[in-house]
A protein has these predicted regions:
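Active-site and donor-binding regions of nucleotide-sugar-utilizing enzymes
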Residues: 3-164
Length: 164
């Protein structure tokens, strides 16, 4: 049985990841999804390590007091995923949380994918180098992202915007 670890940290990511999970399940029947997500991902069969609401924090006044909790959850999640040994890991959006998880899993030999890359073309373009260290493959939602990521050596497939 194939095992895919997938993580979405907010409601929009839950929707996008659930759509991706449904598509993958239509192609691969014998599959297990583990990771972190919300109700839509759980409907698609996700065995969630914790609910994504723990990561759905917006603005400095929500994030700062929760930093110790976020670091602890991230540590526990990485340990759990390394122990579970998924065939691949897919981080959906939530780059501040996902790229660190991806980097640690990539270092342990788990292939990492990222769906909905941050807008490096709009601001903080040097992040592309950090992304390269974190993820093996990007599913881009905008056509102009593909050459940008491939220029620095990140394999990229343009898949279109999931909500379009």
């Amino acid at each position: 049985m194939a095992k895919i670890a997938i993580l979405a940290g907010e409601p929009s990511g839950d929707l996008i990841a659930a759509q991706l999970m449904a598509y993958i399940r239509s192609k691969i029947k014998n599959i297990e999804f583990i990771g972190v997500g919300g109700p839509l991902m759980k409907q698609e069969g996700l065995s969630s390590f914790f609910d994504h609401s723990n990561l759905s924090l917006y603005g400095v006044f929500q994030v700062i007091p929760n930093i110790p909790k976020l670091i602890f959850l991230r540590y526990k999640l990485i340990k759990y995923l390394k122990n579970e040994k998924p065939d691949i890991f897919i981080g959906v959006d939530a780059p501040d949380f996902n790229f660190y998880v991806e980097k640690k899993l990539k270092q342990s030999g788990i292939p990492t994918f990222h769906y909905v890359a941050p807008s490096v073309w709009a601001w903080r373009p040097k992040r592309v180098h950090k992304i390269k260290k974190s993820t093996d493959y990007i599913f881009s939602i905008f056509p102009h992202e593909k050459p940008l990521f491939e220029k620095v050596g990140i394999q990229t497939t343009f898949v279109g915007h999931p909500l379009a």
